[in-house]
Each structure stands twice: as C-alpha cells, then as structure tokens.
C-alpha cells in the first residue's frame, strides 16, 4: 500500500510539476485516487505557475515554404478552428503518465465564463433572433405602455367606383389567455425578473432559462404565466451594477379599530356574522317573557348601524334593554352609551322606570355613544 502511494505521489509530481507536499495534500484529499487528485488540482488552479512543454513538430513531415499572407483556407483549417473553440468550452486536456504505448488523458473542468461574456452572449443571441434595442423612455403619468389596436367598426371601401361602401362591425378581440409583460434585468452577478429576487448565473437551475433567452425563445416559466396569451419580454443591461433589492410595496393596514375625530367614536364590530347571530340569539333567550302578561316589541337602533327587535313585558325596565344590548354586542360592554327616544328626541335617564311608565310600548329606541 505504501509503495502504491509512493508511485502515485511520484507520478503526480511528474505530471503537474508541483511540490511533493502539495501533491501529497491533493492525493490525501482524493483518497489517493490519482485521477481525482489531478482533476482537483487543475480545478483549483494549481497549474497557473507551471510551465507547459510544447511538443516538437515531427521532422518526418515536410512542408514547403509559403508566403505569410496565404489567403487559401483549407477544410482542415476550418476543422482545426472548430476544435480550438470546442477545447475552450470543454476545458484543458492533460496527459497523465503511462508508458510509450499507454497513458491516460484527463480533461479539466470547463472554463468558467465571466458575467460580462454571458450577458454579451445573451444580448447577441436575442438580436440574432429579431430583438430590437430601444432607448429607455420616461413615460408620462397618463401614458399607457402599449398602444391598443382599433377595435371599432368602419366602412369597407369598394374596389370599383360603382360599388357601394358597406359598414362592417368591429369584432371583439378574443383573449385565450392573459398578456404578460416581463422585464429581465441582467446584473453583475445574476438576473432578476421585474422586482423579484436575484438569481445567479452559475445556478444550474437557471441554465435552461438563460439558454432559452440566448436562442431568442420565451422561457417556459414565462409562457406558463401567460396561460396561452402573449409574453412581452424586455431586457435591461445592468451588468456594471450590483443587484439592489426593490423596496416592498406599501401595504395598508387591514385590521380593525375605532373611528376617531368625533365626540362619539364609532365602534367597529369585530365579530363575524355567524358569531354576531349567535350573540343575538343568546341575548334574546336571556330575556324572560311572561306570556300571561302584556307584551310589546321594542326596536333598537345601535350605534354601529345594526338593528335589534326584541319582545318585552310591560313590566320590564329600561335597564333590561341596556343589558340586552350588551349581551347582543359584547364589544359594547366597556363602552359608555345612553338610550334615547326618537320623537321626541329625549334621553332615557331613569333606567329604573318600566317600559309602560316611560311610555315605550312599541317604541323605537336609539343607542348613542358618549
């Protein structure tokens, strides 16, 4: 085992030209797997300071002298140029040891493209497929972002003078989906859609999206948003700027509270309709009615805009009406209010009076907050 590790160490040093301590570090990190260690070494940029030895041109191949400005390009030259482009995308190739007739070739990781190159490629691909560069124009407040086509009726002109013009009614535009307008912003380290979050250029999950843009196609995730409608995509170049998270839209308070600004603030009901109906039923059942005694119906107009109608005996007191209101609207238990008649408008100050004594039989009572 030790001999195999020593052989791997010597071969690593021979291939990379690295120091023995550094070679041992990469081999130990790779579990003494020579291939993985070499790939890790070159991916880490360990070959930056190593001088590569150029291969000598075979002497057996004779070439005639040709002028330096030779304008004839052979098919072999085209293949050679294509191979060079593929090698730039694929990564550098390395030869790992072996004998005269055997050996192993290791392909390094692909060359990472800078964000500037990536953005240039996206704009270039979009222009090749019909995209048009436009200047950013500031819109007036009343200006729409997109002109609407004429959709009214009109007269169809005849082809000959003797033909009469016929009125043609306009057809309504049929929408199979909804039109979507999206702004793609290309930043220094990533891109964003409209006011969304930053998405990295290097994230594999974004590769298909960017490739669709480069081919001049609308990405699938944007087509799904339109549900069959038209997708208008604008691209903005911000490659020299760092991503700035947009400010969140203002969201108004949606809770409940009291209306201020008057001597008698309006109490906003916080109960749901079902809870309110349950409270009113409990309040009605809490009033004990003696059917053998005379009864009357009292209508109560509440300060929150509600209305209650309850049966009482003539012997019930005004204080019983107050308790009924509090049971029907528990939120008013801690609220100061008075009860008043409508015509004439008079406060019922003595709540110990019976309904008959206060002349409130079949009357309308109004609740007023104090």
From Swiss-Prot:
Record's keyword terms, sorted: Chromosome, Cytoplasm, Cytoskeleton, Golgi apparatus, Lipid-binding, Nucleus, Phosphoprotein
Its job: Reduces the ATPase activity of VCP. Necessary for the fragmentation of Golgi stacks during mitosis and for VCP-mediated reassembly of Golgi stacks after mitosis. May play a role in VCP-mediated formation of transitional endoplasmic reticulum (tER). Inhibits the activity of CTSL (in vitro). Together with UBXN2B/p37, regulates the centrosomal levels of kinase AURKA/Aurora A during mitotic progression by promoting AURKA removal from centrosomes in prophase. Also, regulates spindle orientation during mitosis.
Protein name per the record: NSFL1 cofactor p47
Region called Disordered, residue ranges: 54-73, 80-116, 137-157, 272-292
GO molecular function terms listed in the Swiss-Prot or TrEMBL record: lipid binding; ubiquitin binding
Domain UBX, first and last residues per copy: 291-368
Subunit record text: Part of a ternary complex containing STX5A, NSFL1C and VCP. NSFL1C forms a homotrimer that binds to one end of a VCP homohexamer. The complex binds to membranes enriched in phosphatidylethanolamine-containing lipids and promotes Golgi membrane fusion. Interaction with VCIP135 leads to dissociation of the complex via ATP hydrolysis by VCP. Binds ubiquitin and mono-ubiquitinated proteins via its N-terminal UBA-like domain when bound to VCP.
Organism of origin: Bos taurus
Residue numbers of Phosphoserine PTMs: 74, 102, 114, 140, 176, 192, 272
Positions carrying Phosphotyrosine: 167
GO CC term (a single one): cytosol
UniProt-annotated location(s): Nucleus; Golgi apparatus, Golgi stack; Chromosome; Cytoplasm, Cytoskeleton, Microtubule organizing center, Centrosome
CDD domains recorded: UBA_p47, UBX_UBXN2C
Post-translational modification: Phosphorylated during mitosis. Phosphorylation inhibits interaction with Golgi membranes and is required for the fragmentation of the Golgi stacks during mitosis.
Domain SEP: 179-244
Organism lineage: Eukaryota, Metazoa, Chordata, Craniata, Vertebrata
Motif Nuclear localization signal per UniProt: ranges: 109-115, 172-175
GO process terms (BP): autophagosome assembly; establishment of mitotic spindle orientation; Golgi organization; membrane fusion; negative regulation of protein localization to centrosome; nuclear membrane reassembly; positive regulation of mitotic centrosome separation; proteasome-mediated ubiquitin-dependent protein catabolic process
């Amino acid at each position: 085992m030790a001999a195999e590790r020593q052989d791997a160490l010597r071969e690593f040093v021979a291939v990379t030209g690295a120091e023995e301590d550094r070679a041992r570090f990469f081999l130990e990190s790779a579990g003494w797997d020579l291939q993985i260690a070499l790939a890790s070494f070159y991916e880490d940029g360990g070959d930056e300071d190593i001088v590569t030895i150029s291969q000598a041109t075979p002497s057996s191949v004779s070439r005639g002298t040709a002028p330096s400005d030779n304008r004839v390009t052979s098919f072999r030259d085209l293949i050679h140029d294509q191979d060079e482009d593929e090698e730039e995308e694929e990564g550098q190739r390395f030869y790992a040891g072996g004998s005269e007739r055997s050996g192993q070739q290791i392909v390094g990781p692909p060359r990472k493209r800078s964000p500037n190159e990536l953005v240039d490629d996206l704009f270039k691909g979009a222009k090749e497929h019909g995209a048009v560069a436009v200047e950013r124009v500031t819109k007036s407040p009343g200006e729409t972002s997109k002109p609407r086509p004429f959709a009214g009726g009109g007269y169809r002109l005849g082809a000959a003078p003797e033909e009469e013009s016929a009125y043609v009614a306009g057809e309504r535009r049929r929408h199979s989906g909804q039109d979507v307008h999206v702004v793609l912003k290309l930043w220094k380290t990533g891109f964003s859609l409209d006011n969304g979050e930053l998405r990295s250029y290097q994230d594999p999950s974004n590769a298909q999206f960017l490739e669709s843009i480069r081919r001049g196609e609308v990405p699938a995730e944007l087509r799904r948003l339109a549900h069959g409608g038209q997708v208008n995509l604008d691209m903005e170049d911000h490659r020299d700027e760092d991503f700035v998270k947009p400010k969140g839209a203002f969201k108004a308070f949606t809770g409940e509270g009291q209306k201020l600004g008057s001597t008698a603030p309006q109490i906003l009901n916080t109960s749901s309709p079902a809870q309110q109906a349950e409270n009113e039923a409990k309040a009605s059942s809490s009033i004990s009615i003696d059917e053998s005694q005379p009864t009357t119906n009292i209508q109560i107009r509440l300060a929150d805009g509600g209305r209650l109608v309850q049966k009482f005996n003539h012997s019930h007191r005004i204080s019983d009406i107050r308790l009924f209101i509090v049971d029907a609207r528990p939120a008013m238990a801690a609220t100061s209010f008075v009860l008043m008649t409508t015509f004439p408008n008079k406060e019922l100050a003595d709540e110990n009076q019976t309904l008959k004594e206060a002349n409130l039989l079949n009357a309308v009572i109004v609740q007023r907050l104090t």
